[in-house]
Amino acid sequence: MASTKDEVVRMSVDEYWEDIKDDYLIQLANTDPNEVYPSNNPGPTTADGQINFECHCVGHLVGSPCGFEFREAITCQKTNSDGEIEQGACGKELMSFMECVTRTQCFGTGDNDKK
């Protein structure tokens, strides 16, 4: 019995570049992105200067095996001045994060072949 979970649809290059015919898709294509995504993700920092841990740019770090250590290190960095950081603030947190990365190899390429 064939699975009905997935369906492969093939189209030619010409079909791909044809005008959109579906009314809903036409409406969606002509909609302002801010209306489609009303909670547009602002990036790594929110408007009030807080850390946006939901940003796609840090989401993989937060969700990694070293996510706790990452959050500790970045929170420390954001709550201390450049001068305090130069004086050694956040060193413990950063080292804890780096030790976790080294220990778990959570940012490896997934390529097990030795070169």
Swiss-Prot record:
Sequence motif Cx9C motif 2, residues: 90-100
A molecular function GO annotation: protein-disulfide reductase activity
Disulfide links within the chain: C66-C100, C76-C90
Source species, domain of life: Eukaryota
Domain CHCH: 63-108
A Gene Ontology term for the protein's cellular component: mitochondrial intermembrane space
InterPro entries xref list: CHCH, CHCHD4
Keywords: Disulfide bond
Motif (Cx9C motif 1): 66-76
GO BP field: protein import into mitochondrial intermembrane space
Name under which the protein is recorded: Uncharacterized protein F42H10.2
Source organism: Caenorhabditis elegans
